[in-house]
UniProtKB/Swiss-Prot annotation:
Biological process (GO), any one: base-excision repair
Reactions performed catalytically: Endonucleolytic cleavage to 5'-phosphooligonucleotide end-products
Gene Ontology MF term list: deoxyribonuclease IV (phage-T4-induced) activity; DNA binding; DNA-(apurinic or apyrimidinic site) endonuclease activity; phosphoric diester hydrolase activity; zinc ion binding
Name of the protein in question: Probable endonuclease 4
C-alpha cells in the first residue's frame, strides 16, 4: 500500500497539519514542528498537544506515515565546534518535540563542510552529532535525506549515507529519505526502466532498502547531475512522469511516507490523485 501526501503548513499550530493533509486527500504528510528558520521556539503547550492528537485521530493518518522535517539552520557537520553544538542543541529539541507528538521519525539534511574541512571529517561530525542525540532520546528514527550536492552540502552520494549509517551505534534509530529531485540532480537517473533499476540496485547494494524510511516526490527544474536543488511540479520538470509511475508500482516503497514538496501547492490534491491512479 502506498501512503502519499505533501509537506503541509502547520501555521497557527502543529494540529493544523493533519487538517491540511486531509483537505488534499493525503494519506501521509510532512510538517515542521516549529519555525524552520529560527533556532529556538517556545515549548509545545498542553492545549496544542491535545489538539494535535485529536486532529491526528480524525485524519486517520498513522504516525509512521508522517515525516517531520527539522530546521534549515541546523548543520550537524559544522566545522566549527561551537556552531555545531548550537546545531546539536536545536536538533535535540526537534527530536524531543517528535517524542511529545508521538512521531517515530525526523527527517533532516545531513550537513555541510563549508569548504573548511574534508568531506570525511564532516561526515564524522554528522555521525557523532547523531549518536549524541540518539543517546539522549528514544523512539525517534533520525532520517537522513539525500541532497542535490549544492554548495558544500554532503549526502548527495549513496556512499555518504552509508558512511554515516555505519558510524551510528544504534542502527534501529537511523533511516534515509530519498528525494527524487535531489537524487536526479546529484546524477542518479530514474527516467527509464533501465536507469531506474540501475539506480535502485545501487541504492540497495550501498545503503539498503531496510533503511528507506520515507521519500520526497519531486520533479526537477535542473538537468541530471547539475548539483542544483530546484523542485518542479510532477511531469513538468526534467524527470518526467515515467519515474513516478515506476515508484508507484514498486513494492519497496510501500508503507512509508511519500511526500510531495512540489512547487504549486494548489495542485497537490491533483498530483496525489494522479499518483494513486498510476498504481496497477
Amino acid at each position: 500500500m502506498k501512503y502519499i501526501g505533501a509537506h503541509v503548513s502547520a501555521s497557527g499550530g502543529v494540529f493544523n497539519a493533519p487538517i491540511n493533509a486531509t483537505q488534499i486527500g493525503a494519506k501521509a504528510f510532512a510538517l515542521f514542528t516549529k519555525n524552520q528558520r529560527q533556532w529556538s521556539a517556545k515549548a509545545l503547550d498542553n492545549k496544542t498537544i491535545d489538539l494535535w492528537f485529536k486532529e491526528l485521530e480524525k485524519s486517520k493518518i498513522e504516525p509512521k506515515h508522517i515525516l517531520p522535517h527539522d530546521s534549515y539552520l541546523i548543520n550537524l557537520g559544522h566545522p566549527d565546534s561551537d556552531a555545531r553544538e548550537k546545531s546539536i542543541e536545536s536538533f535535540l529539541d526537534e527530536v524531543q518535540r517528535c517524542e511529545i507528538l508521538a512521531l517515530d521519525r525526523l527527517n533532516f539534511h545531513p550537513g555541510s563542510h563549508l569548504r573548511k574541512i574534508s568531506e570525511e571529517e564532516c561526515l564524522d561530525n554528522i555521525a557523532e552529532s547523531m549518536n549524541r542525540v540518539i543517546d539522549k532520546t528514544s523512539g525517534v528514527k533520525l532520517v537522513i535525506e539525500n541532497t542535490a550536492g549544492q554548495g558544500s552540502n554532503l549526502g548527495y552520494k549513496f556512499e555518504h549515507l552509508a558512511y554515516i549509517i555505519d558510524k551510528i551505534e544504534d542502527k534501529s534509530r537511523v533511516g534515509v529519505c530519498i528525494d527524487t529531485c535531489h537524487m536526479f540532480t546529484a546524477g542518479y537517473d530514474i527516467r527509464t526502466r533501465e536507469a531506474y533499476d540501475k539506480t535502485w540496485n545501487e541504492f540497495e547494494k550501498i545503503v539498503g532498502f531496510k533503511y528507506l524510511s520515507g521519500m520526497h516526490i519531486n520533479d526537477s527544474k535542473p538537468e541530471l547531475g547539475s548539483r542544483v536543488d530546484r523542485h518542479d511540479s510532477l511531469g513538468c520538470g526534467k524527470i518526467g512522469w515515467d519515474a513516478f509511475e515506476f515508484i508507484m508500482n514498486d513494492k519497496r516503497m510501500n508503507d512509508i511516507p511519500l511526500v510531495l514538496e512540489t512547487i504549486d501547492e494548489s495542485i497537490w490534491a491533483e498530483e496525489i490523485k494522479t499518483l494513486y491512479n498510476f498504481i496497477k
